[in-house]
Every structure is written in structure tokens, then in C-alpha cells.
From Swiss-Prot:
InterPro entries: Arrestin, Arrestin-like_C, Arrestin-like_N, Arrestin_C-like, Arrestin_CS, Arrestin_N, Ig_E-set. One of its GO terms (biological process) is G protein-coupled opsin signaling pathway. Detected in retina, in the proximal portion of the outer segment of rod photoreceptor cells (at protein level). PANTHER family: ARRESTIN, S-ARRESTIN. The lineage of its organism: Eukaryota, Metazoa, Chordata, Craniata, Vertebrata. The keyword Heme does not apply. It is found in: Cell projection, Cilium, Photoreceptor outer segment; Membrane. It comes from Homo sapiens. Belongs to the arrestin family. Binds to photoactivated, phosphorylated RHO and terminates RHO signaling via G-proteins by competing with G-proteins for the same binding site on RHO. May play a role in preventing light-dependent degeneration of retinal photoreceptor cells. Its main location: other. One of its GO terms (molecular function) is protein phosphatase inhibitor activity. This is S-arrestin.
Length: 405
């Protein structure tokens, strides 16, 4: 019997994501939709499938994990290429169970106890070489699927021995999009710093620029203070000092598309006269909220009806083929100086230098503390509405009642 909506403060709610096949033969349950890449290891996908034996009628039930790269232009098929490439596929049979049963995770223990004897656990792991979820933001008027890397978990019942995609009854299958999200390594690199000097015509001494950050890794939503020192030994005036956060996205699969997009900008009000020095700190805050309408910005992947953020910096692990990563994302601070010329604005020149840094998610405080046994499990059901393509529109619907017994 379901408990009332009141829950103890000492027993936190934990959302369980649930989706039912059209014929109600299989139901999949996941405890997360974001799975963390800790650099040294990746959080596995653990969940359960609830099977209705009367509806399955002797079929086998499988769960699959697929990682795919989409180029984003479905008409590319015209020139002999496919617009999608599967980077990884794995499949496990959950019903009838095969082989020795593995020890269930804490989440699975709670769900097995809650859902009864027709519930079967599964565990899917990410190989070390897979990329994290990433997509290039489409323009508001764009239609179709976005360019990027996505992950999908699928459960289905079939009587086919090879379980090929075209032989799976769609009414007996259910799928959920998930994300693989990069979190920062525990150790930071050296403090970023860059220096540059330029010699101008008719000036004996150079213009010198130094740019530094106070650390190498910044977290999403964290302000970035940029210290700029301009030493102007020339006879010219530095009229403008601008600092940018630039996102660099390199599509390395199918093509070599290269996107450099400014995602934050600040300008100093001061000028630097001849034979003087200025030190100034400009604070930048790169946020998706300020870039939502801009086509080609790389995001951390997006699940329908849920928000996301700017893409995290790509970590290329040793020995991994970089082309398999699909889209490589990096960030840099660019400081640009506008220097006066002999004829004023008409002959002014611009010089710039860049400092790389990484933008990432912080590591969780202590993932080992997470426990489901004392939590109130709240089911969030994803129903089908207005299916327009094979992607299946998803809409979250939180159950009103807790299911803690």
C-alpha cells in the first residue's frame, strides 16, 4: 500500500525514472539519467526491468546500451554517407535470467523489494574510450536531430534469436535517453598564464601583454577573474581592452568542422597611454543562459524537457583515438587590445593572446554515501505523446504519491 504524501525529513526522496512499453509487457526503471565520468572510472547504468510473464508469453527480454554520433543533417545520406554512426552497443538478457546472478546494487535491492518477483536487475558499463554526451545547439528555426553524441538505454521483449533492431516489436520495447557527464579530475594543472609582445612601426620599444588566471579548472556557473597587465612602452595609446571566453568545438568524426564561439565578454573602461602600465582584473561568467539563441554552441547533451549547460571540456585519455570522441570541446580566455594608429580609427590595429583553461562539473562530495534503502522512492513516469519519429517524444510526469511502504 502506498504511503501518504508526508515524508520524514530524515528519509529523503529519490526519483526513479520509469517507462512502460506500449503493450505493457516490460517496464524499465532507472535511478539516474545522468551518469558521471570520474575520469578514472565511469558510473555504471544499474536498473531493473519489470516483466509481465503473461504478456511476454515465452519471449526473451533484453536491455541494450547504445552510444551514437549524429551528424545532424539527415539529407547527408544523399552523398553516400549515413547521418548516424553507432560508437558502442552492448546487450544483456535479463529474462529469463542467464548465468550466475550478480550482487544487486543498493538501488536494485530497493526496487526488487518494492516491485516483486517479476523484477530483474541489469548492469551496463561504459568502456573507457567512449565520449561524454555533447550536442551542437541548433538555431531556433532548425528542425530535425542535432549534431552530437547521445546515449540510449532500451528494454524490449522479442522471440527473435538475434534480436536485430528491425525484428523488435515496437509495442514491446521502451527506451530512455541518458547522459554521460564529465566531472573534473581531482588534481588541477598549473596556473594558466600567457605573455606576448608586439613591435610597432616607428616605435623603439614593444607593447607587452600578460594574462593570468588563478587556477586551471573552473566549474559551470563560477565567475572567472582574468588578470590583465598591459605595459605600453610605445608611442601609441591602447584604446580598448576586451576579454572573451571562447568555446572551441572541433567535430572530428565525418568532417573537420571547427567552431570558435565567444560565450562571455567584458571590456575595461580604462585606456593605456604611451609609456604607462595598467593592471586590471576582468570577471567573465560563461553561461548557456546568455547564449540560448546561438547556433553551434556545444552543450553537455540535452534530454527533452530538461535544462542543460555549456559543454564541459573534453578529456582525451591516454591511448584513446580522438576521432571516436565525436566532438572535442575546449575553452580559452582571449584578451584583445586595440591600439591607435597615425590616422586614428582608420589605421588602428588589434593584437591578442589566448590562455587555455577547463570548464567542468565538480566531483560529488561523497558518492559512496548515496543509499536508497531509507529513501522514499518517487516514480517519474515518461509517457509517449504525439510520436512524430523514431525518437519518441518524452514528457516527464511525477507521480503524486510516494511509494514508500
Amino acid at each position: 500500500m502506498a504511503a501518504s504524501g508526508k515524508t520524514s525529513k530524515s528519509e529523503p526522496n529519490h526519483v526513479i525514472f520509469k517507462k512502460i512499453s506500449r503493450d505493457k509487457s516490460v517496464t524499465i526503471y532507472l535511478g539516474n539519467r545522468d551518469y558521471i565520468d570520474h575520469v578514472s572510472q565511469v558510473q555504471p547504468v544499474d536498473g531493473v526491468v519489470l516483466v509481465d510473464p503473461d504478456l511476454v508469453k515465452g519471449k526473451k527480454v533484453y536491455v541494450t546500451l547504445t552510444c551514437a554520433f549524429r551528424y545532424g543533417q539527415e539529407d547527408i545520406d544523399v552523398i553516400g554517407l549515413t547521418f548516424r554512426r553507432d560508437l558502442y552497443f552492448s546487450r544483456v538478457q535479463v529474462y529469463p535470467p542467464v548465468g550466475a546472478a550478480s550482487t544487486p546494487t543498493k538501488l536494485q535491492e530497493s526496487l526488487l523489494k518494492k516491485l516483486g518477483s517479476n523484477t530483474y536487475p541489469f548492469l551496463l558499463t561504459f568502456p573507457d574510450y567512449l565520449p561524454c554526451s555533447v550536442m551542437l545547439q541548433p538555431a531556433p528555426q532548425d528542425s530535425g536531430k542535432s549534431c552530437g553524441v547521445d546515449f540510449e538505454v532500451k528494454a524490449f521483449a522479442t522471440d527473435s534469436t538475434d534480436a536485430e533492431e528491425d525484428k523488435i516489436p515496437k509495442k514491446s520495447s521502451v527506451r530512455l535517453l541518458i547522459r554521460k557527464v564529465q566531472h573534473a579530475p581531482l588534481e588541477m594543472g598549473p596556473q594558466p598564464r600567457a605573455e606576448a609582445a608586439w613591435q610597432f612601426f616607428m616605435s623603439d620599444k614593444p607593447l607587452h601583454l600578460a594574462v593570468s588566471l588563478n587556477k586551471e579548472i573552473y566549474f559551470h556557473g563560477e565567475p572567472i577573474p582574468v588578470t590583465v597587465t598591459v605595459t605600453n612602452n610605445t608611442e601609441k595609446t591602447v584604446k580598448k581592452i576586451k576579454a572573451f571566453v571562447e568555446q572551441v568545438a572541433n567535430v572530428v568524426l565525418y568532417s573537420s568542422d571547427y567552431y570558435v564561439k565567444p560565450v562571455a565578454m567584458e571590456e575595461a573602461q580604462e585606456k593605456v597611454p604611451p609609456n604607462s602600465t595598467l593592471t586590471k582584473t576582468l570577471t567573465l561568467l560563461p553561461l548557456l543562459a546568455n547564449n540560448r539563441e546561438r547556433r553551434g554552441i556545444a552543450l553537455d547533451g540535452k534530454i527533452k524537457h530538461e535544462d542543460t549547460n555549456l559543454a564541459s571540456s573534453t578529456i582525451i585519455k591516454e591511448g584513446i583515438d580522438r576521432t571516436v570522441l565525436g566532438i572535442l570541446v575546449s575553452y580559452q580566455i582571449k584578451v584583445k587590445l586595440t591600439v591607435s594608429g597615425f590616422l586614428g580609427e582608420l589605421t588602428s590595429s588589434e593584437v591578442a593572446t589566448e590562455v587555455p583553461f577547463r570548464l567542468m562539473h565538480p566531483q560529488p562530495e561523497d558518492p559512496a554515501k548515496e543509499s536508497y534503502q531509507d529513501a522514499n522512492l518517487v516514480f517519474e513516469e515518461f509517457a509517449r505523446h504525439n510520436l512524430k519519429d523514431a525518437g519518441e517524444a518524452e514528457e516527464g510526469k511525477r507521480d503524486k504519491n510516494d511509494v514508500d511502504e
